[in-house]
Amino acid sequence: MIISASTDYRAAAQRKLPPFLFHYIDGGAYAEYTLRRNVEDLSAIALRQRVLKNMSELSLETRLFDETLAMPVALAPVGLTGMYARRGEVQAARAAAAKGVPFTLSTVSVCPIEEVAPAIDRPMWFQLYVLKDRGFMRNALERAKAAGVTTLVFTVDMPVPGARYRDAHSGMSGPYAAPRRILQAMTHPAWAWDVGLLGKPHDLGNISAYRGNPTGLEDYIGWLGANFDPSISWKDLEWIREFWDGPMVIKGILDPEDARDAVKFGADGIVVSNHGGRQLDGVLSSARALPAIADAVKGELAILADSGIRTGLDVVRMIALGADSVLLGRAFVYALAAAGEAGVRNLLELIEKEMRVAMVLTGAKSIGEISADSLVRELGA
């Protein structure tokens, strides 16, 4: 299959992956309304073309949490990344490091912190949930520190798991899920060999290291479901500050009031996010939520955004709407599933090229020059 655009990797991933894995990353919550609007709302934003601006000098570099990024992009935390390619978190982290952008390891990764961190030559980020098992949380923070993690991404929009109906249809969950997954793997021999056989162990490395026994796919939903904590409040974040003195980014902000509370708390950054449409269906897309949040807290902390970003044009749109940087989730997992580390590197190169074209043709010579003036109109205008 020819890959000529960043969006081509989705079809390539679907061909290679067993359905339960493809639909797990591709799907969203309930009727997937927000999942669709994330992409549609971004695509509806028109950029303002400008010409004859002498764009011979152009820089995509940006500074974030005392790090220099080659472009305002980081790879988002995605659970079970290691099921999409052999030791997938390591491959994705290497690709990100090679392109000069951060990689964020998920709490529920296949590869543990201690396997991923030594594989790259730049510090990585780590994502953590609020869980009932505070001992696990403290253990994860201590291990992250020891591994040289620089930035903590704290996910706050999962006090309960979202209802992802597509998972039950595809075999990720629901009746007879385990035998259905086995049958699907048998009809996808390339994945079965590369990941199913050579990619073992298939446990959740960060959790297994704490529990002292493997935490396999069968335990994944049960363990998380039993440990998500609906009593989460800002006091829990204060408790985390006792164990983490580095940059802390709060992921899952969609309302300006919550953004202001993050400033009061002393967060270093927020991620404007609806969890890729995987939690509460019917909420605002990140693109629609971002401008009001930027108006409320721009300059008081770093604003990142995710959900719906598939191309370099989308990155430029999010920056113009008020983000300082973005997180790529599904986009990099599609590329990883299709072509491993090389696929993720190529995806980032395509994103960079698309950004350069957009910046040249909107007259923005640096990331700092991308603003609302780069847009023909704002959403809803």
Curated annotation (Swiss-Prot):
Assembly, in brief, is: Homotetramer.
Name this protein carries in UniProt: L-lactate dehydrogenase
Write down the InterPro entries for this protein, in alphabetical order.
Aldolase_TIM, Alpha-hydoxy_acid_DH_FMN, FMN-dep_DH, FMN_HAD, FMN_hydac_DH_AS, LldD
Q: Which residues form the FMN hydroxy acid dehydrogenase domain?
A: 1-380
Catalytic residues, per the record, are 275
Keyword field:
Cell inner membrane, Cell membrane, Flavoprotein, FMN, Membrane, Oxidoreductase
Q: Name a Pfam family for this protein.
A: FMN_dh
